[in-house]
Regions:
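Conserved glycine-rich cofactor-binding loop
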Residues: 18-19, 42
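Residue(s) in the substrate-gating loop at a strand-loop-helix junction
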Residues: 148
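Active-site helix of classical SDR
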Residues: 124, 165, 173
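Substrate-binding pocket helix/loop in short-chain dehydrogenase/reductase
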Residues: 100-101, 105-110, 213
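Alpha-helical segment proximal to the catalytic Tyr-Lys
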Residues: 129, 178-179, 241
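Short, small/polar-rich loop/turn modules that mediate ligand/substrate recognition or access, typified
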Residues: 181, 186, 243-245
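Short-chain dehydrogenase/reductase
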Residues: 241-255
Length: 256
């Protein structure tokens, strides 16, 4: 691997890293040489995924419920027992909720906003001391927040809270990028379009729905796992050291 993209000696945390986009990113960071912690509410699933990913490098699974501030604080306590500094934080954990507009529940709205925005803020807040220990002018610490093209476009698919939550996350990320750049912490957003995941399985398992969905994408296909991994590696390595505050769609041209 070219030195511009090497993550040798770096330590990363990927929330929601046991499946989907989180797993894609975790594998990519491992392949680039990083030591990677993955966390999620299902500790057994995280440990199982970590065992599978350990063929690519050192991967550790942790149980962490990030739906509230208490969980973020507990995760920070656990990491402080294990590491001296955190070089890379990928906030991938999130959720969605779909229902017709007339019956869309307030509890669904609040859950999506809590997990997709507030929990990310709490996680960054609690892990900031470890990130500060890492960042320097030559090699800043990196925070990647996983947004969505739903936060850029206006297609809601009856997931009325999801797009607004991701738009809020995009703006929060820009605010934090400005706030933390002087402390050598870069904050960027990856805004995925369609990639294989549990959240998109209802489309990929339906041949007609898949054909209709792909027709909306200029490249006429969904994203591949290695394409997500490669973008994350770029942002976390020397290749992305001069980037902060960016909202990067990876969507096959969907938002053009």
């Amino acid at each position: 691997m070219h030195r511009y993209f090497s993550l040798a000696g770096r330590t990363a945390l990927v929330t929601g890293g046991s499946r989907g986009i989180g797993r894609m990113i975790a594998q990519g960071l491992l392949e680039a040489g990083a030591r990677v912690f993955i966390c999620g509410r299902d500790g057994a699933a995280c440990e199982a995924t970590a065992a599978e990913l350990s063929q690519y490098g050192e991967c550790i699974g942790l149980a962490a419920d990030l739906s509230g501030e208490v969980g973020a604080r507990a995760l920070a306590v656990e990491l402080n027992k294990r590491i001296e500094q955190l070089d890379i934080l990928v906030n991938n954990a999130g959720t969605s909720w779909g229902a017709p507009l007339e019956s869309y529940p307030v509890k669904g709205w609040e859950k999506v906003m809590q997990l997709n925005v507030t929990a990310v803020f709490s996680c960054i807040q609690q892990l900031l001391p470890l990130l500060r220990k890492s960042g320097n002018e030559q090699n800043p610490a990196r925070v990647i927040n996983i947004g969505s093209v739903a936060g850029i476009s206006s297609m809601s698919e009856e997931a009325y809270a999801y797009g607004p939550s991701k738009a809020a996350l995009h703006q929060l990320s820009r605010n934090l990028a400005r706030e933390l750049v002087g402390e050598h912490i870069n904050v960027n957003v990856i805004a995925p379009g369609r990639f294989p995941s549990k959240m998109t399985r209802f489309i990929s398992n339906d041949e007609a729905a898949m054909a209709a969905d792909v027709a909306l994408i200029p490249m006429k296909r969904w994203g591949r796992e290695e394409e997500m991994s490669a973008l994350a590696i770029t942002l976390c390595s020397a290749a992305g050291a001069y980037m902060t505050g960016a909202i990067i769609p990876i969507d096959g041209g969907f938002t053009l």
